[in-house]
Swiss-Prot record:
Job of this protein: Involved in correct processing of both the 5' and 3' ends of 23S rRNA precursor. Processes 30S rRNA precursor transcript even in absence of ribonuclease 3 (Rnc); Rnc processes 30S rRNA into smaller rRNA precursors.
Documented EC number(s): 3.1.26.-
Main location: cytoplasm
Protein name listed in UniProt: Mini-ribonuclease 3
GO CC aspect terms: cytoplasm
Keyword terms: Cytoplasm, Endonuclease, Hydrolase, Magnesium, Nuclease, Ribosome biogenesis, RNA-binding, rRNA processing, rRNA-binding
Enzyme type, top EC level: hydrolase
Catalytic center residues: D19
Protein family membership: Belongs to the MrnC RNase family.
Compartment annotation: Cytoplasm
Gene Ontology BP, a term: rRNA processing
Entry keyword Hydrolase: yes
Assembly and binders: Homodimer.
Length: 133
């Protein structure tokens, strides 16, 4: 997929791939930290991938103007997208913010912005790492 095609995707599609990419980042990080027991992996992964965690990261990013205008465009596209799925363990607003978060990861991945995606991950890690067991 080229950049132009990626930029035309709807917010849900971007969040779909962004969710998968972010999940891989988290899983690799946890394994690298030496966590191997399934219960601990799941418990700690949830601290990164839950809608509440992703909303917390976006809030922290907003406080320091971390997101570029380009990224904000795709965050809003994801946040404002109408999804058929419903929030499981959170309110609708938090769920939509997390969809926006995942959409940013998706657009960065699909447009091959690897350095910026790493910066995004590093910021996310710093924001959530203090909550790890």
């Amino acid at each position: 997929m080229n950049k132009q095609q990626a930029e035309l995707l709807n917010g849900i599609a971007l969040a779909y791939i962004g969710d998968a990419i972010y999940e891989v980042f988290v899983r690799e990080y946890l394994l690298d930290k030496g966590l191997t027991k399934p219960a601990m992996l799941q418990k700690n992964a949830t601290k990164f991938v839950s809608a509440k965690a992703q909303a917390k990261i976006i809030s922290a990013m907003d406080e320091v103007d971390f997101l570029t205008e380009y990224e904000l465009t795709y965050f809003k596209r994801g946040r404002n997208a109408h999804s058929k799925t419903t929030a499981k363990n959170t309110d609708v607003v938090t769920y939509r913010i997390s969809t926006g978060f995942e959409a940013v990861v998706g657009i960065l991945h699909l447009t091959q912005q690897k350095e910026r995606l790493q910066e995004f991950w590093d910021f996310s890690l710093k924001t959530i790492e203090a909550d790890l067991v």
